[in-house]
Regions:
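Glycine- and aromatic-enriched mobile tails/lids
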Residues: 10, 16-30, 34-224
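Short loop/turn motifs at secondary-structure junctions and domain boundaries
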Residues: 5-9
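Flavin-binding catalytic cores
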Residues: 1-3
Length: 224
């Protein structure tokens, strides 16, 4: 399986970007599959967005410079990296946790194993299991920097898992049949959920924000 993923190039999902492809994180730009708001753009769209994002990033740096990183943040990351490279008592490998992650999403979070169908009880189970895997990932061991990269890739994907689960749970309807079938809410609910479902990761918790749709022709820009 390949779940989880947030693919802005195929669906209406993706990270919130403005017209310059800036995300809500200052200095971070996105294009292609991770950039939301334009489904079915595929490779040509990714190439165009990549150029827009690159030019915007250059403009951002020229106007704002590169902010220095606080030494405390550097020390914290060095300590984390060293812990992955030195402790050898991990009960699981990165590959085992990745397979477990994919199994959880496939089975409980609307994955291919259930033909993209799910209910709230399954989502609760998925959320619980993904949090368990996230805790287990703290104790992983990397023999070299290549394996270290795999650990961080897994941890990022586990965060994406939590986001996918939170968004599926927040939209109490079925809007795109065959892509995601909410068995508890099998019908479309324009009255309550003809909206954007946004989220923010704040202090380790995902906060869901429902926003009204913007009519065609008008921009939907964020402000940091």
């Amino acid at each position: 399986g390949t779940e989880p993923y947030i693919v802005g190039g195929h669906t209406a999902s993706g990270y919130w970007v403005d017209t310059k492809r800036a995300t809500t994180v200052n200095g971070l730009f996105a294009g292609g599959d991770v950039a939301g708001g334009a489904p079915q753009k595929y490779v040509t769209g990714a190439l165009a967005e990549g150029e827009i994002a690159a030019l915007s990033a250059v403009e951002y740096v020229s106007e704002n410079g590169i902010s220095p990183i606080e030494s405390s943040n550097i020390d914290s990351h060095i300590s984390e990296v060293e812990s992955f490279l030195t402790k050898k008592d991990s009960r699981f490998t990165t590959e085992q946790l990745e397979e477990a992650m994919q199994s959880v999403m496939d089975s409980y979070a609307g994955g291919i194993k259930t033909n993209y169908r799910f209910n709230e009880k399954q989502l609760d189970i998925a959320d619980y299991k993904i949090k368990q895997l996230t805790e287990l990932s703290d104790s992983l061991y990397a023999e070299d920097f290549q394996e270290l990269m795999y650990i961080y890739e897994l941890r990022e994907r586990l965060t994406v898992c939590r986001s996918v689960i939170a968004h599926l749970k927040a939209r109490k309807e079925t809007r795109w049949h065959s892509f995601a079938e909410n068995l508890d809410y099998p019908n479309k609910d324009d009255k309550n959920f003809n909206k954007y479902v946004n989220s923010r990761l704040e202090n380790g918790e995902i906060k869901i924000i429902l926003r009204d749709l913007v009519p065609g022709g008008k921009s939907y820009e964020h402000s940091n």
